[in-house]
Amino acid sequence: LAVSASPPPPLYGQSVIDAIDIRYSAETDRTTVVNMTNHSYFNLDGDPSKSNSDYLLTIDADAYTPVDSTFMTTGEIVSVEGTDMDFRTPTAVGARIDNDFEQLKNGKGYDHNWVLNTKGDVTRPCATLESPSTGIVLDVYTNEPGIQIYAGNFLDGTLTGKKGIVYGHRASVCLETQKYPDTPNKPEWPSALLKPGEKYDSHCIYRFSVKK
């Protein structure tokens, strides 16, 4: 298996200074599973001691893949309609995260995969995260069918980053473009199998702007 990750030339009118543009590629000599993503933590306030609770999150997804109490996907694809998983309109991350809802209990908050409506269209944002405090907006684009949103539920103030900064509980958000979790055991889902002669190509763009 040969794998590479590189920033390709800027696409879709984006400049190097306003976007992180990642492309993963892989080829193999034996059938294997490939499902790469980026687990960066985004804090749009520049202050890791602050919670992400007021960040506005939008996800272009009508459904998600629920998890059980062990964080394993159940194999279902469930509508977000009428649930705390509905982010089709801008909603504060913290507005419902502690609600008495089974999925939020299982994930200790948001740590789930959403089934994207973008259907591989990299010119259309699949998710948007915005800080009302700074006006910084992060748009995410991908050719993948899913995105995992992790709200930093297990950040507990014990991790120290650069310049001695402590990362507090839910101080940031991860937006991870991907195939759905556990796809090798869910043959009806988009496959993560890579066979000899095939090429894996996964594209993720994080584009930043400031709302005026």
Feature locations, PLM:
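An exposed, glycine/acidic-rich loop-and-rim segment of catalytic or binding clefts
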Residues: 1-212
